[in-house]
Amino acid sequence: MNERQFQKQVINFLNEQEIYHIKIWGGGFQRAGIPDLLCCVNGLFFALELKAENGKATPLQMYNLQKIKKSGGLAMILYPSQFNQFKQFIKEVKNWPKPNFPTQE
């Protein structure tokens, strides 16, 4: 499975689970190294860098993942072989108690 096929599979899963996510399109108008998907589930921010099974993150991608982790978010490189484990993790996070954040409601 190539990275594009895997990305489609992950996005379909996020849509099925009604997970808020944004697909980042790399290019001249965007800062380089931003993870492929920025997501929020049950108050948890996480960033996904999607790779084919033999893919490797660039140093800039690794730098941005580390910055997200240092800021309290979850950031990971996700490979197809980890997808089932990731799906289970998301389903568990959806069942966590909702954080008591102040809102403007």
List where the protein language model places each region.
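Catalytic phosphate/metal-binding cores of nucleic-acid and nucleotide-processing enzymes, i.e., regions
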Residues: 1-105
